[in-house]
Amino acid sequence: MFNEITKSVTWNGKVLELSTGKIARQADGAVTVKMGNSVLLCTVVVANKAKEGIGFFPLTINYREMAYAAGKIPGGFFKREGKASDREVLVSRLIDRPIRPLFHPAFVNETHVTCSVLSYDPEIPVDILAIIGASAALSLSPAPYLEMVAASKVGLINGEFVLNPTLELLKTSQLDLVVAGTSDSVMMVESEAHLLSEEQMLEAVKFGFESFQPVIKIIKELAEEAKKPKLEMQDLYPASLKKEIEKLFVKEIEQAFAIKSKQERSTNLDLIPEKVLTHFVSDIENKKYSNYQIESALKAIESDILRNEILEKNRRIDGRSTTDIRQIACEIGLLPSAHGSALFTRGETQSLVSTTFGTSLDEQIVDSLEGEYKERFMLNYIFPPYSVNEAMPMKVPSRREVGHGKLAWRAINPILPNKVQFPYSIRVVAETTESNGSSSMATVCGSSLALMYAGVPIKAPVAGIAMGLVKEGKKFAVLSDILGDEDYFGDMDFKVAGTSEGITALQMDIKISGVDFKIMKVALEQARLGRLHILEQMNKVISKPNNELSKNAPSTTTIKIDKDKIRDIIGPGGKVIKEICEISGAKIDISDDGTVSIYASDRDKLKVALDKIKAIAVEPEIGEIFNGTVMKVLDSGAFINYLGNKDGFVHISEISEERIETVSSVLKQGDIVKVKLIGFDNKGKAKLTIKNADKDKSSNNTKPKTNAKDNSEPEQRRDSSKKRAWNEDNNAETAEVITERKYFN
């Protein structure tokens, strides 16, 4: 019944298996990818005919993670997979980028590639399998897919490169890099790095490139046995058509490209296609040429003009040399109500960035095949239509916006402080207000400025730069800080972000074959010099984080309590913690280890919540001094309430150094007095003294001492030995330790 064909290879100690002919047999191409316990189904469907009047290649890639692959039922009301998650969007783009340039340039038939994770093994990088499976399925389909692509993931642990590291290993890795390419050249790189040098990054790319060559071999073997006849393709346009357009319109195109302003240049260039189509209207009606052929020939002429100026004259359309960076302007603190803000402008590209602090309750919850986890740092990239003067409605975040945001996130994440150093969740929003190339790198620069102004103690400022490439034969030019047109007509988009010490993120997309490691080395070094120049300009405005947070930022403090006290703070059904939040206006988050984080809009609210938590969870120690309230006066003494919910007794002899006739002559109900805990009676009730309590210089009112000496009698040391044991088990962090962050002093 099935004519199944299978090819396999042992790759990094595990068997990688590609098979076809059993599942999804009606699709134009279908490959099942297996490695470990991971199983993916990758399918391709190609439309029989191209749509009339289409002027681009309509390739759609959809990567899906089925919940059942990890033995889970989807969350939510409908209990089924729905809108693509950010992770699925990012992997879809990861598949698309190395594959899209490898189709015949004249191919415009609608093509759909679907990669579904059917079984999930956390030891196997399924995004890598998806790229491999998509490439294999395309090689079997009728689509004119010209090269086979494979991919690998590279980590760096203890100075050694690791192929396809597990999720657990990636937690300790200095590098998370994905590289994809053909048997001859690298096509795509995506990475996050912890301040690695250009040499280390290049070696990592080489390592990954060499590692996936055996995979390309089995894709080719599978295609040789199972591929379908490829669609026959003609040239994108007749050579005679291009020559005729050049003869008639080349001077007008050159004049338009000589305009340095993007807005004016685009306006003039946009007038030319209509003139060209009008000239060839009879040929279009007679079906000698199609609109797409004419527009493609015109684009080729525009490309030739731009590329020749660069290669022959070392001159770009805005007048810069290949290494020049556009003029930079930086401004900080322009949004008074935001916790941090910055405006970064580079030429005609501009990003307005804001930083907002939240609590641990504001962290992004992510539900993935690995399980649920939280992201403390969020970065949202927004690309509104007005940034390129387009009259379009604002829509939900596009795939491009998700991808650019993640790239900027990768660039910033390695230099952020950990949660102990900075207890807030952080959201950065970067809105591209103008765009003419490299808006994602403007986002990186603006984010670094906004974070420093907000007072986030980042390790070092970060800047990003986009590099381009123009290559004809052996002649090439690497371009620094590319424009939109240079990206469109060029051969490479190479984005590098990092500090003055090293790289934090790298993304490379190559549109042609034959880009070797020599060119990549030149591009990396040129990017380093450009990055240092940009950092120098940024540092003139702000070079290190502000010492204080914005007055609009929430206040926070933490207190460590005994884990047994957690239930007391929460209360039945959360009653107690809800009441504390309502009374104080603060937000409270309790970790399983007994760390209580309190967040409030001001310090007064913070103190109210802190005092109430301490009253419940903190056990007083002998020798500590508190503010107390006289609750009841007796002939023999008085009952005092302290720490909110604790009561003790002051004997008449402990009220004053001098002899007093009656307690009521000194104390009245409602009086506020300072009291010192001097011990406990045989029933465990607190014994207090007022004598000299207000003169004790060690008094800190409500802040308990963690190292107070225990001078009480044995029967008075109520559970003190138990407390000491608990403290030792918790690295001497006692239940009474309060940490108030320096950012609020």
From Swiss-Prot:
Main location: cytoplasm
Stretches assigned to the KH domain: 554-613
GO biological process: mRNA catabolic process; RNA processing
The protein's required cofactors: Mg(2+)
Single GO term (MF): RNA binding
SMART domains: KH, S1
NCBIfam families assigned: polynuc_phos (TIGR03591), PRK11824.1 (NF008805)
Listed name of the protein: Polyribonucleotide nucleotidyltransferase
Organism ancestry: Bacteria, Pseudomonadati, Pseudomonadota, Alphaproteobacteria, Rickettsiales
